[in-house]
UniProtKB/Swiss-Prot annotation:
Catalyzes the reversible isomerization-deamination of glucosamine 6-phosphate (GlcN6P) to form fructose 6-phosphate (Fru6P) and ammonium ion. The gene is nagB. This is Glucosamine-6-phosphate deaminase. It is an enzyme of class 3 (hydrolase). It catalyses: alpha-D-glucosamine 6-phosphate + H2O = beta-D-fructose 6-phosphate + NH4(+). The lineage of its organism: Bacteria, Pseudomonadati, Spirochaetota, Spirochaetia, Spirochaetales.
Amino acid sequence: MRLIIRPTYEDVSKWAANHVAQKIKEFSPTKKKPFILGLPTGSSPIGMYKNLIELNKSGKISFQNVITFNMDEYIGIEQNHPESYHSFMWKNFFSHIDIKKENINILNGNALNLEKECEEYEKKIKSFGGIMLFVGGIGPDGHIAFNEPGSSLTSRTRIKTLTQDTIIANSRFFEGNVNKVPKSALTVGIGTIMDSQEILIIVNGHNKARALKHAIEKGINHMWTISALQLHKNAIIVSDKNATYELKVGTVEYFNDIERKNFNNDLK
């Protein structure tokens, strides 16, 4: 697993956007050979999305032949609800780029048969040959998507009950009212994410420091689902300095030394 440490959230966002854009450019997607991209919601990727929008508007990258799969969606709120992940993605990314609507895939939290919705999502991902690059963020407790502590590290797309910690953390998007936060969601599983050819995780802020420590320095543990990345052959965590405060000095120095030549990844 690689760890790229950048000074600020802005630097992290730029690095992540450049990495995604470079992967798409290198693949040279076409209509018959699309690039399959997994995407997150939440506060962590917003800066990356802003940078990708600028790269798209400047003509450096196109999303016309990119097919996206989002990680998760709340159960029981309408797609046009301002805090649904459908709304989030259109507001912060999709409406600003040249992606085709038919190439966007987001779980339907209002499907009549939620279990079937999850099964069909898995089948659709597999029908495209799997996800080439899955971008994600993590919660303070180390969860990826809505794979809360205790989730199976081989789990697939499914219905998940949210922990009180996650509900409290997400209440900032619901006027600070925990009672307005949905109590369950549909989410891709850890196994779904781990099947991706490459995983890129964005980590920023002091409140993610303990999760990053468990991801990098501790053992694999289903109570810290981010730790599953240790088993992936091509996983990258890009972190700001604030999130590294619980790492050992030697760990930080080690990764800074071996990744120094990769700090500047501006598009060529």
